[in-house]
Amino acid sequence: MDHCPRLYLASASPRRRELLTQVGLAHTVLHLPAPPGEDEPQWPGEAAADYVLRTARDKAQRGQIWMREQNLPALPLLAADTTVILDGRVLGKPADRSDAVAMLAALSGTKHEVRTAVVLVHEDRLYEAVSITHVSMRALTAAERERYCDSGEPYGKAGAYGIQGLAGSFISHIDGSYSGVMGLPLFETAELLRRAGIALP
């Protein structure tokens, strides 16, 4: 737990922690019981754009319940969810190696979309924002995809890659938020905090 936390983070993602620390926001991670499965399934007929906001809201709701159950001090609660969207299809976290290889093969040589939804709950009010970034990935050989999976980096990441790691060399161009692709768009997050009356350092 950080000294004098200013908000709760309803996420175990080390990348989101790093990004909050980068902008000087002391926080405490809520270690929420994980829902069944690696990813919340997309509902039949649900648009990919709606999916990412729903899953971020779900995280915020579970965080609120956890805060009440644990009798935690009242602080703002921040939740986020990131997904990769290719041709309208959600690519979440890979279930295993074959899933990761298949995702990388699908993304290879494409321009795809990364959406990160951010939800802030403060004094019973809900604040929301969605970051949309277009990412161009160069064509990857089968050997490159296999080597990348050997590194262990694809697992636990939407779309089976992390832009801040080894996969950074796969990305030829982005149009949007680099921090959003990492998992927490700092500009949008700061705007939510300002709207809620929470001063940044």
UniProtKB/Swiss-Prot annotation:
- Per the UniProt record, the source organism is Bordetella avium (strain 197N)
HAMAP family cross-referenced by the UniProt entry: Maf
GO BP term, pick one: nucleotide metabolic process
The record's InterPro entries line, in alphabetical order, gives: ITPase-like_fam, Maf-like
Q: Taxonomic classification, please?
A: Bacteria, Pseudomonadati, Pseudomonadota, Betaproteobacteria, Burkholderiales
* Annotated protein name in UniProt: dTTP/UTP pyrophosphatase
Keywords (A to Z) from UniProt: Cytoplasm, Hydrolase, Nucleotide metabolism
Which Enzyme Commission number(s) are on file for it? 3.6.1.9
Report a single Gene Ontology molecular function. UTP diphosphatase activity
- Can you quote a single GO CC term? cytoplasm
